Amino acid sequence: MPIQIIIDPLPGADRVAVLNDGRLIAYFEDDGTAAAPRPGSIARARVERVFAENKMIACRLDVAGGSIAASLRWPGGAMPKPGDRLAVTVAAEAREGKPIQLRRGVVREDPAMIFESRGRGLRLSRRLAATGFEAPAALVDLALKLKGEMSITLRLGAAKLDADTLLARAVGLSEEVKAHAESAAASTSGDGVISTGPDAASTAQHIFPAAEVIMDTAGSRWQETDLDSMIEAAISPRCQLAGGAVLHINTPPGAAVIDGDSGNSNLSPSALAGAMVVPVAEAMLLRRISGPVVIDFPRLDRTAMQRIDAAMRDAVADDPLHPVCHGFTPGGLYTLTRPWRWRPLAELLAPTPQRLGLAALRLARRAGMGAKTGIVVVPPAAGNWLNGDGAAYRDEVMKGLASRIEFLSDEGCVQTRFDAQVMKG
């Protein structure tokens, strides 16, 4: 069965689930009310403070209703001064009390390459160079033409593409970077977003380009596969493995810790370690685990450690954030670092009034397709959102229904992240 991308559309609030052989491996969603720009957005930032000793810059970005803090690590060269305006790309969402992260210039990337609007020519990533890969002559020629304008970094994914496909992607990305860089240079709209980053559906299709895309307008596929239960399970600290073994996943601020437990299985330490590898890689993508990660595999001999290290590197090779595997410590713990980009899944799914209100709208949409009238019962917090900040969402969904659906606030209504109560008339 091919990888499937299931899109549950709602104006400004699409949900996107990615399934591999029936397993949920990634989840994304849009938030049309978010003030902060999405990763991949191009913006102009205003320099506030410069920390030359650690090459960090504190910036401000103009957004609807004010401005937000942002952080930029300076890649080298003469540092800017407070008050300077810079073209930047949003690299990561805010997390753990830290502001959103920026990258200097316009940056566009795919699994095979990174283009930046700074001239450094063509280079291979360390992992790609280790394979003995040689860049096609046509791509080298393109890099020479662009030298001084932008740089190209080829990634491990480049080795999977033929020369013509690689060149076509490079030309497309170079044109995109050039257009965004020109827009940023010409912008007179202040220190804000010039171009928004990819939405949830585009992000999923970018990461899984060969996946089958299913537009689930009625929500039937979402219900049939019980995706809400899968998503709920994805924020549990326990992940069940085949044969009764268990992964314990803890993600406190600072570093994530993943521990394997044989549970009710009869797996040997070596077999348990092998059974952990792919689920660990999938859990990091699905749960959006980033930063330092410590994995407590069962005690292994040196040969088994080498085998598990190679398996981990293979398992994360296609991760869009390209984790760096450090290997086993002398104490037997396995460590890696996964770059930041998105908020952790548990934080994304926190049951806020907005999330509860959106769940009620999805239920109203499903109920409205099979009944002349209906009442969706929601807790007061969700009702207040639907009648306030969420009124535009509510009106957009309701005008697409042939039936009449009303929302009733009830103190006794118990609502999860995903469900409300419905009574059909």
Predicted segment positions?
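A generic structural signal for short beta-strands and their flanking turns/coil linkers
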Residues: S41-A43, I68, D84, G332, ...
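Conserved glycine-centered short motifs in functionally critical loops
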Residues: K55-C59, A94-R104, R108-E116, G243-K424
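SF2 DExD/H RNA helicase N-terminal ATP-binding lobe
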Residues: A35, A78-K81, R287
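Extended, charged alpha/beta regions that create polyanion-binding interfaces
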Residues: M1-A36, S41, E48, V63, ...
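Structural signature of multi-pass, alpha-helical inner-membrane proteins
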Residues: A43-R44, R49, K55-A58
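OB-fold (S1/OB) nucleic-acid-binding surfaces
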Residues: C59-S71
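Alpha-helical multi-pass transmembrane bundles of energy-transducing inner-membrane proteins
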Residues: A69-P82, F297
